[in-house]
């Protein structure tokens, strides 16, 4: 199953060994993200390290492991799609996630940002949905 992952799910996986991290390492999913996700993570680096109560080196190792499971899509690859999406949601920086969803023909976007649900064109998944898909891999979305 192809899933575009929002930065809030990566941050959650970095902060705590939780359901989010288990989903991220689940082989039933193929994760994609726009390249700007790395900047988003870096912007909150100090907060993540503090909340996770880990050292910088541990953060780097964990981040590296997580990004082994995410294919980063360059803005050059989805640039043309951005123009077609217009203002699909209020937070325009998040439009890149929708563009990547189209570009890779993903099944949906995994996020806990509720404003993603303001639009009806793309499927938005939360942890509970991802857990269900993981346990029912042969089912339709």
Which stretches of residues belong to each language-model region?
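Short, well-structured N-terminal submotif of metal-dependent ribonuclease cores
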Residues: 1-33
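PIN-domain endoribonuclease scaffold, especially VapC-family toxins
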Residues: 26-28, 35-84
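Active-site neighborhoods of divalent-metal-dependent phosphate/nucleic-acid chemistry enzymes
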Residues: 71-108, 114
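Short hydrophobic/aromatic-enriched beta-strand-loop microsegments
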Residues: 31, 52, 124-128
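Residues that scaffold the ATP/ADP-binding catalytic core of kinase and kinase-like folds
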Residues: 13-14, 40, 44, 119
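Alpha-helix capping/helix-boundary segments
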Residues: 10, 37, 97, 115-116
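Acidic, PIN/NYN-like endoribonuclease modules and their adjacent C-terminal/linker elements
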Residues: 102-141
